C-alpha cells in the first residue's frame, strides 16, 4: 500500500512538470495565506490558556496630537511619528502577551490618522486589541466627510471608524477564546439599493487565562445613529449586554477587567461625557451591574494623564479601582502582570526611549488607600 501511495505522488509530480496539470500559482498562494491565517488563529487561542503573562494597557495615541501645534495639521505629523515610534519600540521590547488600546486611535476618525497609528502601534509581535474613543466617532458625527474617497456624507469619518472596528471584531472572533460581541449585521434590500445595517454597541469580550477582558469603547451608555451611502449604524448602550456577559464570565470562574475610554470625573468643562448628573439612571445601572459581578478593575483613557482611584463606595464604581492610562503620545502606559487571578499594575512612561517606572501600583484590590470619591458626583 505504501508503494502505491508513493507511486501516485510521483505520477502527479511528473504530470505537473510536463504541463499536463495547470497548477494555479495564485491559488497556491491563496491557500498558503489561508492555512497560515488558520494556524495563527489556532496558535493565539492556544496561548490564551496561559495563566501567567503580562499585558500592556494604554490609550490615546491620537495622531497627530501633541502638547502643542494643530493636531489635525500635517506639520504635527513628523514630530508625532518620531515620539510615538520611540514609545512603541519601548513597549515592543517588554514582550507582552497582548496589548489593549482604550480609544482615541485617531484625532478625528480619519483614515490617514488611523494608518499612522496602525503603522506605529500594530507592528508588535503580539496582538493589539482596540477600543473606540470620542475622537474616533463621537466628535465627528454629522460634520466630517472623506472627499478623497468621494464620500460626502456628513457621518463619513465616524462611519469609517465603526467599519474599521467591525473588521477588527471579525478578526478577533477567530482568534480569541470565549469571544463575545454585541453587534449584528443585516442587509436591507430596497428597489434601487442594498443597505448594510449594523446594530449594537460594538462591545466585545474574551478570556485569557483566568481573566475575562471586556471592551466597551467610548462609554457604556453611548448611543448614536450614523448614515452613509449604503450603510446605517445604530450604536446602542452596552449595559444589557454587559450584564449577561459578566454573568457568563462569573459562571466560568473568571475575574474581569473592564475597559472603555471616558470615565473622567464629573466636571463643568463639558469633557466628561459619561459621568454627568443627567446620566444618573444609566450610571446607577452600570454600578449595579459591575458590583454584582467579579470585576477586579476598570481601565480607561481620555484625560491624557495617568491616575488611579478607588473609593469605598463610589456612586458609579463602588469599591472597584479605576486606572486611567494617560496618553501614548506622551509615552504613558500600564504594564499588567497576571499570575492566575492575581493582577499587579505598574505605571510606565517610554518617552525617553526606555521603560521608566513611574509607580508600582501594587496588586489590584490589596491597596488600603481610599479616595472619598472617584466620580465626583
Show where each model-derived region lies.
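A short C-terminal boundary segment appended to hydrolase-like catalytic domains
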Residues: 27-32, 36-38, 49, 337-377
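Hydrophobic h-region of N-terminal signal peptides that target proteins for export
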Residues: 13-19
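Loop/turn elements at helix/coil->beta-strand transitions in domains of secreted/extracellular proteins
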Residues: 51-54, 94-99, 124-129, 208-213, ...
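Active-site-proximal segments of metal-dependent phosphoesterases and phosphodiesterases across multiple
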Residues: 68-77, 220-240, 249-297, 318
